[in-house]
Amino acid sequence: YQLDSFPTQQNVRAGRFYPYYRVKRLAAEPLLDAIDTSTGRPTKFKNLPLGTRAIELPDAEYPNYFLNTFGKPRRASVCECERTPDENLAQALHTLNGDIVSAKIADPAGRIAELMKAEKPPLEMIQEIYLATVCRLPSAEETEVCQQIVAESPSPKEGYEDLMWA
């Protein structure tokens, strides 16, 4: 799962053997689950225990603005064609300005708050954020940029929250 998403001169001709990861859009349910996992804050669905993942929802009777915005089908038929794979303005605005993602990142019981309580050194904080969000360690150049962002932020917590959001 940690394959590079860019083809190289060595592997570009071996496309059918999956030598690199082909980037594709996540469906609504796995996307919300990924956000929950990376931020450390699960979504609460009505009448279900905390920690129930979006992918585990038994039917379409669990309204959720995020899932609806990102194309979760109503399941009126068994056809996968109900799912809307296209990006739209509502998704872009929700990602940029929506309160769900930012609230999960800034949650006092979330991953950033827990890392701050552990008083880890800045490099470890950046590495943890990268592993939680993009499943890899940052490159030396990325680490340098991240350290600069945190240093220029009003507070370290806000800097780390900005890194996770980005």
Regions found by a protein language model. Give the residues of each.
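An acidic, gly/pro-interrupted, aromatic-rich
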Residues: 1-137
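C-terminal structured "cap/appendage" subdomains that terminate the fold
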Residues: 116-165
